[in-house]
Amino acid sequence: MPRIALDLNREADRQKVKGQWRLGPGLVPGEPNEGLVAQILNTPARLAEYDDSKWEICNNIRQSISKGFTFAWYRIAVTLPAEIDGVALTDSRVYFETNVDNYGEIWVNGKIDRATGVIIGINTQYRVEVMNKAVPGSKHIIACLVVNGPLAEPVGGIFMRYATLAFESRN
């Protein structure tokens, strides 16, 4: 099965899908106390139509940010190309693969697959389907919530170890 993998931390690879990472601190970026309130039912940052245009641009998802009990969202919009390096991508399976420190959630187009989109634990690799059959020109929003842990005594900061957009041919 031929595979093409783009490292979404590399500018050259992000350009192939017209992507740019944005970083929004907090569970609900821009809200008082970063949106941390008792019994919150959801956060709009997970939704595809959420406006992240005022968030800072993040050119290095591997850079550790913050300290202590922290939440942040990493979001990227990608547009699937017809080909990469001469290889046609139509009908390929498309996956987003990542590893975050410590807990995370992966939302694709405003939805989460609770079986594959919840990251529990440091150094755990995760892979979620973006699209079963690639359609050139289709746009997808990938939103990753990252949380530092353990929650009662967090150490270090938050970051994404890697983020890959993979295209796997059916042939």
Residue ranges and their predicted role:
Residues 107-128:
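Solvent-exposed beta-strand/loop surfaces of large extracellular or lumenal domains
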Residues 47, 55, 70, 78, ...:
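Aromatic-lined ligand-binding clefts that engage carbohydrates, nucleic acids, or primary amines
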Residues 69, 89, 121-123, 134-137:
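Surface-exposed coil/turn segments at beta-strand junctions on protein surfaces, enriched
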Residues 48, 52-67:
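Surface-exposed, low-complexity/disordered Ser/Thr/Gly/Pro/Asn-rich loops and linkers
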Residues 61-68, 75-77, 85, 115-118, ...:
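Beta-strand-rich interaction surfaces with strong enrichment in secreted/lumenal proteins
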Residues 102-105, 114, 149-152:
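Flexible loop/turn segments at secondary-structure boundaries
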Residues 82, 100-102, 120, 132-134, ...:
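Short, flexible loop/turn elements at secondary-structure junctions
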Residues 1-47, 55-57, 134-171:
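An acidic-aromatic loop/edge-strand motif
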